[in-house]
């Protein structure tokens, strides 16, 4: 086990994101309950969760839209931090522990 010098944002699509996704692509079968969280590693020490989310919201949203195969031309216009907080459930923390002996690649 090794402590990693990073914090994290765990991001899971909310039901609003899944509803939008299904309106974009009717073949989508996933539900909000089945959606898996993605963990993004960030700076280890931070004091203001809102500032951290504001800093990384665009990168995370872009990554998530791409992860679900959404064409950039169809992304919501004027997507801001308020939309982000409604479309994604986020947990932040500052402790990451690698349980494996193999190096991270």
Where do the model's predicted regions map?
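Extended, charge-biased low-complexity segments
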Residues: 1-44
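Amphipathic protein-protein interaction modules
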Residues: 42-104
């Amino acid at each position: 086990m090794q402590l990693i010098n990073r914090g994290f944002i765990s991001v899971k699509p909310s039901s609003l994101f899944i509803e939008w996704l299904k309106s974009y692509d009717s073949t989508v079968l996933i539900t909000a309950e089945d959606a898996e969280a993605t963990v993004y590693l960030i700076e280890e020490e931070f004091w203001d969760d809102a500032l951290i989310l504001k800093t990384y919201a665009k990168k995370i949203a872009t990554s998530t839209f791409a992860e679900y195969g959404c064409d950039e031309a169809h992304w919501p216009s004027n997507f801001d931090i308020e939309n982000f907080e409604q479309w994604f459930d986020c947990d932040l923390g500052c402790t990451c522990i690698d349980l494996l002996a193999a190096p991270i690649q």
